[in-house]
Curated annotation (Swiss-Prot):
Subcellular location: Mitochondrion inner membrane
Protein name listed in UniProt: Sensitive to high expression protein 9 homolog, mitochondrial
Main location: mitochondrion
Topology feature Mitochondrial intermembrane, residues: 303-381
Signal peptide: none
Role, per record: Required for the maintenance of the structure of the mitochondrial inner membrane. Involved in mitochondrial morphology. Causes growth arrest when highly overexpressed.
Mitochondrial matrix-side positions: 403-405
One CC-aspect GO term: mitochondrial inner membrane
InterPro entries to which the protein is assigned, alphabetical: MDM33_fungi
Membrane protein topology class: Multi-pass membrane protein
Keyword Phosphoprotein: no
Length: 405
């Protein structure tokens, strides 16, 4: 069993839950056996076996789930470690770049023609760039490996990595099958040549045997050689026949393996696609539910708050505009009143100046008018009467003066 002594708290809690469930099932089994003690042994033994079988099956399924959980956690930890490693490598490259800029051995910038400093070198351009820009560039360089790692982790979780291994196995089987077919063709060709060679040697032997009575020493030597060659050809033919039989069996086995591997691949891909389809369906439902919750939150909470905020801001703007308008009107009215007061004060000053310019008789007339309390019309009539009497008296005096002269 897997040692869970040094697991994380989450893993230890999961293992504890599994152990509690197993203990619960054992308690159920023990209670069941205690209740069945009063029954017959014939009816008690099959029930105990069935419960033990179910208990073992459940225990095995729980252990399989636990092992899958540990395997998936290990895969995620491995890929997370690779991602952290790529980020650390990017930071290391930045540190090396800054260190190289301070190295005196690679810091020669003198132009021998003009005795001036060479500017705008690539290292200077890199240093003038912002640090986050350089980090982003290195992170983007390691992004490909990170994406590959993330894709591999996703394939490991969904089980597509095993399908990929099955595809690779199919390709290898196909290559082996092609090589086996080629080897079978070569062996069959060699087997055919061996048969032809043996047939030819047997024909020559038969010809020599037909004239056995007239053999010469060379014929005897030739017969011995042909007999040895025939034995060798027979052995070679037998070996090639066995090789052809073996390679044909191997070809049949590879063909059967290829057929079964292709069927298994399509079957597993169908299961994987159904799983992904179900997952995408549930993911779609979850997204729809999330969007629905967001819509309800926006409509019931955020929209009224936004409406109140807009209304309050609009009322504030209207109130501010009205205050500005009232201030402008008050300013205009105040200016108008000040202008009227200025005009009245000017009129009063003009009247006072006019009053100061009046003659003595006008002052006397005004004093008499104010003392007698006569109205303006009555005073004008009295003034006309006095003027007429005055004119009449002046005329009489002028006449008397003329008579006296």
């Amino acid at each position: 069993m897997y040692s869970y002594r040094y697991l994380r708290p989450v893993s230890r809690s999961g293992r504890a839950i599994l152990i509690q469930r197993q203990a619960y099932l054992r308690n159920i089994t023990f209670t069941h056996f205690r209740c069945e003690e009063n029954k017959s042994s014939a009816s008690k033994r099959p029930t105990g076996n069935a419960l033990n079988t179910k208990l073992n099956e459940l225990n095995g399924s729980l252990n399989n789930l636990w092992n899958k959980f540990l395997e998936g956690r290990g895969v995620f930890q491995h890929h997370a470690k690779n991602i952290r490693k790529s980020i650390q490598e990017a930071n290391k490259k930045i540190a090396e770049q800054e260190k190289e800029s301070k190295d005196a051995k690679i810091n020669y910038k003198k132009d021998e023609l003009t005795n001036e400093e060479i500017k705008d070198l690539p290292s200077e351009r890199e240093l003038h760039r912002k640090k986050w820009s350089r980090k982003l560039e290195f992170y983007l360089d390691s992004l490909q490996e990170t994406l590959f790692t993330a894709t591999k982790a996703l394939n490991d979780v969904t089980g597509y990595s095993s399908i990929q291994k099955l595809k690779n196995s199919i390709n290898l089987i196909n290559e082996k099958l092609d090589a086996t077919r080629k080897a079978r063709t070569d062996l069959k060709l060699q087997y055919t040549k061996a048969i032809e060679s043996r047939t030819l040697s047997q024909k020559q032997l038969n010809e020599l045997l037909q004239r056995k009575s007239s053999w010469s020493p060379s014929d005897l030597e030739n017969f011995t050689k042909l007999y040895k060659d025939d034995a060798i050809n027979q052995q070679t033919e037998k070996e090639l026949k066995e090789k052809v039989r073996d390679i044909e069996k191997k070809e049949e086995q590879l063909t059967d393996d290829l057929y079964r591997a292709i069927l298994t691949r399509y079957h597993e891909e169908q299961i994987w696609s159904d799983k992904i389809r179900r997952t995408s369906t549930w993911g779609t439902f979850i997204l729809m539910g999330f969007n629905l919750v967001l819509f309800i939150i926006f409509q019931l909470l955020l929209e009224p708050w936004k409406r109140r905020r807009l209304t309050g801001s609009f009322e504030g703007k209207v109130r501010h505009a009205l205050e500005l308008h009232s201030q402008e009107q008050e300013t205009k009215i105040r200016d108008f009143l000040e202008e009227i007061k200025t005009k009245e004060s000017n009129n009063i000053a003009n009247e006072q100046k006019t009053i100061t310019k009046l003659s003595f008789w006008d002052k006397l007339r005004n004093t008499f008018q104010n003392s007698t309390g006569l109205s303006l019309t009555q005073f004008n009539m009295l003034e006309l009467t006095v003027t007429a009497i005055n004119s009449f008296l002046v005329g009489i005096l002028f006449t008397l003066l003329l008579h006296a002269l």
